[in-house]
């Protein structure tokens, strides 16, 4: 899914089947109101094929959250043979980039739309979904940043270590694109000294993998240069065998 990050699509990540059920409406509702297409993604096979009991949405609840004015505007903007319009005409580079810059305001406004619908879902379900979610000790000095199914495993590790008095935590990335640095900074514990960023990919020849580079840029721009940042690239994690 990292290959899609430059397409202009917003990208929303889920960790497990229940989160897929809970947050999929956010992608649809925010796409309609925010006027930006969404990629709603989760781990292929690890999450998509997982057998798990989940709480399903009541369509009446979804209807209450739907902005019908935005739906009307969305339909009016769609291609319609009764109201033909020309799109995708040729542009030279100078005009194309002016159009791309003109889109900035839409992407800057989108996180607030996503956050609004997450808030509506939290009210319905009693959850606490946010652009980034923190889990662990309030005074953690070591933090993992990750997205996808690894987060469920990481939560179990956090529970095990905090029960032993370790000061550790996890930040789960929900809205991957647009990347919101301020939202990430809000959930990083003030006591954090070391951060490990987990990327489930490998880009040979790159300075770092995608999520790591986003986090590194956020910390650099915020002047948090004292935090030790570590990149971790993985496909799957295994426990060491006992001797």
Specify the residue positions occupied by each region the protein language model found.
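Conserved thiamine diphosphate
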Residues: 1-44, 68, 217, 221-233
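A general structural motif
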Residues: 113-129, 146-154, 173-181
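Metallocofactor- and cofactor-centric catalytic cores in central/energy metabolism, strongly enriched
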Residues: 172-176, 180-181, 212-221
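Conserved small/polar residues in nucleotide/adenosyl-binding loops
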Residues: 235-241
């Amino acid at each position: 899914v990292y290959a899609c990050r430059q397409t202009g699509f917003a990208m929303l990540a889920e960790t497990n089947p229940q989160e897929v059920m809970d947050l999929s409406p956010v992608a649809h509702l925010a796409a309609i109101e925010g006027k930006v297409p969404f990629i709603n993604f989760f781990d292929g096979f690890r999450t998509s094929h997982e057998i798990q009991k989940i709480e399903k949405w009541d369509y009446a609840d979804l209807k209450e959250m739907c902005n019908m004015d935005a739906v009307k505007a969305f339909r009016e903007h769609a291609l319609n043979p009764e109201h033909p319009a020309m799109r995708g005409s040729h542009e030279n580079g100078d005009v194309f980039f002016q159009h791309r810059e003109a889109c900035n305001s839409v992407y800057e406004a989108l996180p607030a739309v996503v956050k609004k619908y997450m808030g509506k879902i939290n009210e319905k379900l009693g959850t606490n979904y946010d652009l980034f979610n923190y889990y662990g000790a309030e005074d953690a000095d070591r933090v993992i940043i990750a997205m996808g199914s690894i987060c469920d495993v990481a939560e179990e590790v956090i529970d095990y270590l905090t029960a032993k008095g370790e000061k550790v935590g996890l930040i789960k990335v929900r809205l991957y694109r647009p990347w919101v640095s301020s939202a990430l900074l809000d959930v990083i514990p003030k006591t954090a000294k070391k951060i490990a960023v987990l990327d489930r990919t490998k880009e040979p020849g790159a300075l770092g993998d995608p999520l790591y580079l986003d986090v590194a840029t956020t910390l650099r721009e915020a002047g948090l240069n004292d935090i030790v940042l570590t990149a971790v690239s993985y496909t799957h994690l295994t426990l060491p065998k006992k001797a």
